[in-house]
Amino acid sequence: MTGAKRKKRSVLWGKMHTPHREDIKQWCKRRLPILEWAPQYNLKENLLPDTVSGIMLAVQQVAQGLSFAMLSSVHPVFGLYGSLFPAIIYAIFGMGRHVATGTFALTSLISANAVERLVPQSSRNLTTQSNSSVLGLSEFELQRIGVAAAVSFLGGVIQLVMFVLQLGSATFLLTEPVISAMTTGAATHVVTSQVKYLLGIKMPYISGPLGFFYIYAYVFENIKSVQLEALLFSLLSIIVLVLVKELNEQFKRKIKVVLPVDLVLIIAASFACYCTNMENTYGLEVVGHIPNGIPPPRAPPMNILSAVLTEAFGVALVGYVASLALAQGSAKKFKYSVDDNQEFLAHGLSNVIPSFLFCIPSAAAMGRTAGLYSTGAKTQVACLISCIFVLIVIYAIGPLLYWLPMCVLASIIVVGLKGMLIQFRDLKKYWNVDKIDWGIWISTYIFTICFAANVGLLFGVICTIAIVLGRFPRAKTLSITDMKEMELKVKTEMHDETSQQIKIISINNPLVFLNAKKFSADLMKIILKESDSNQPLDDVSKCEQNTLLSSLSNGNCNEEASQPCSSEKCSLVLNCSGLTFFDYTGVSTLVELYLDCKSRSVDVFLANCTASLIKAMTYYGDLDTEKPIFFDSVPAAISIIQSNKNLSKASDHSEV
C-alpha cells in the first residue's frame, strides 16, 4: 500500500515537472520574438514600407558605421560589420519593432578609452610594417579591433548575466530626467571628441576625469594650427546636413521618400576630394583603404578582459539604457509591449556574438530609430532588408570610399546627435513640473561631462533614490472608509433611468518613478476587462498591503472592484488627496492614463488635487479644456457627472 502511494506520488511529481509541448512553444516565442511576429507578417501591407525604410536605414547604417568606427579608434571597415551582424541578431531576439541596432556613438566613445589605453598611437610604428592575412590590414589595426571586440564581448556577457538575474525589473530606477541628462552629456562628449577632425587639428587622445575641458584647452592653445580646408568642409557639411534634414522633417507628409542627404554628402565629398586630390595637395585627412569582404570569425583576446572591465560595464549599462528608452518609446507610440528583461538578452547576444566577427560594441541609436518612424517602417523586416544593402556595400562599394574626408564623417556624427543635444529643451518642462527633477538633470549632466557617461548614470540613479527616500517619510497616506464604489441610478429629466457606473479610486501614496508603473498597471486592471472573468485579480485584492490604489468599498478591495467599466457609461473619479508629492514620471503617467481612458470613452475626473499637481498636469499634457476635470472634492465631481448625464439625456430626447 505504501509502495503504491509512493509510485502514484512519483507519477504525479513527474507530470508536474515534465514540460508540456505548449509550454515549450510559449517559452520559445517569449525568448525568440521573431517566432511570434514573423508568421503573422502581412506581405501585402508591410513589405513595401519596410523595404523603403530598409533602404533608407542602410544609408544611415553605412554612414554611422564608418563614423562610429572612427569614434571607437578602429578602422572604418569594422563599423560596417558592426552595422550588419548586431542588427540581424536583434531582429531575432529583440522586441522593439522600430529599434535599429548597430554602431552607437556613446558605446563607441566608451570603447575608445580602452582602445587608446591598451593600443595607443605611439605603438603604431612598431606594427605598421607588418601586415596580417586578415583583409590586408596591419597588426596595429587588428590589435585595436581586438580590444574593441573584447569590450563588446564582456559588455554583452554582463548584459546576459543581468538577464539571468532578472534585473530588467530594476529599470524603473532609470527615470526620464536621468536618462535624458546622461545621453545629453554623453552626446556632448562625442561632439567634443570630433573637434579635432572638424578643425583638422593633430592632437593626442585625451580622456579621463575632466578630459572634456582639457580637450578644449588644447584646441585653444593650438588654434593657429587649424586647417582651413577641413574647417570649411566641416561648416559646409554641417549646414547642408542640418538644412536638408529640417526640410525633410517639414515636408515628410508631402513627399513619399526623404532625401538620403548622408549618402549624397558622402558621394559628393568623396568625388570632390578625388578630383582635387585634397589628400596630397592640402593634407586633408581621408578614410583611406577600405577592404571588401568579411574575414573569418576570430575570438576576441580573452587575456585582456580584466583590463577592459570598466569600459565593458559602461557599454553594458549605457547601451542598454539608451536602447531600452528607444524601445519603450516606440512601444508606447505604436501600442505594443516590450519586456525589459528580454531586451537584456537581445542586446547581450547582439554584443557577444558579433564580437567574434570583428565588431565594435552595439546599441540602438536615436537617429536610426527616428528614421524608421519617419519612413513608415512596420516591423524588424526593415532592419533585415537594410542588412542586405550593408552587405552589398561591404563586398562591392566599400573600396570606393577611400577619398571620403574624415571631417565629413565628423560632421555626420555631430549632426546625427542633434536629437540628443536638443534635450536641453527638456529643462524648461522639468522646471515647470518638478524643480527637484530639474536639479537632478543638471547635476547628472555635470557629472557626465566631468567624468563619463556611466559615472553620470550611476550618480543620477543614486541621487534620485536618495531624494525619494528623503521625501517618502514625510508622505501622508490617506485611507477613506466611508465611500463606496457605487452603481448609481441616475434619474434624467425625462424620468428615464440609466445605469451609470462611477468608480471612485483613492491614490494613497506619492506618485513618483518608483511606483508609477505599478500605479498604471493597477488602475488599468480596474478599468479593463480581464480575459478570464472568473480569475480574481490578486494584485487588486491585496491593494491595502502593496498597491497605490484603493478601490473604495468600505476601505477594502474586493472582486467587485475589479469589474470593468462599461465603455460607454463609466466615469472614474480619482481622489488625489493622498498624492502629497510627485515627480515628472508620476505626472507623465497620470496624464497618459487620462488620455488613454479618454480614448476608451471613460470620463476621468480628479478631486482634491493640489495646486502644484493641477499646474504640472496642465503644463505637461493636452488635457480636455472643454469641460472641467479638476474638482475640490469627490461629491463635487459626482455632482458634475450627474448633471452631465441629465443634460445628455435631455438633449437626446429633444432631438427625438
From Swiss-Prot:
It is a multi-pass membrane protein. GO terms for biological process: bicarbonate transport; chloride transport; gastric acid secretion; gluconate transmembrane transport; iodide transport; monoatomic anion transport; nitrate transmembrane transport; oxalate transport. Expressed in the Reissner's membrane epithelial cells in the cochlea (at protein level). Expressed in the retinal pigment epithelium (at protein level). Abundantly expressed in parietal cells on the glandular portion of the stomach. Lower levels are observed in the kidney, with expression in the proximal tubule and thick ascending limb of the loop of Henle. Also expressed in distal segments of nephron, in extraglomerular mesagial cells and a subpopulation of intercalated cells of outer medullary collecting ducts. Expressed in the thyroid gland. Residues 641-656 are annotated as: Membrane targeting. One of its GO terms (cellular component) is lateral plasma membrane. Residues 1-75, 166, 221-222, 276-306, 365-383, 470-656 are cytoplasmic. Residues 97-144, 188-199, 244-254, 328-343, 426-448 are extracellular. Pfam families: STAS, Sulfate_transp. Keywords: Anion exchange, Cell membrane, Endosome, Ion transport, Membrane, Transmembrane, Transmembrane helix, Transport. Residues 492-641 form the STAS domain. This is Anion exchange transporter. It comes from Mus musculus (Mouse).
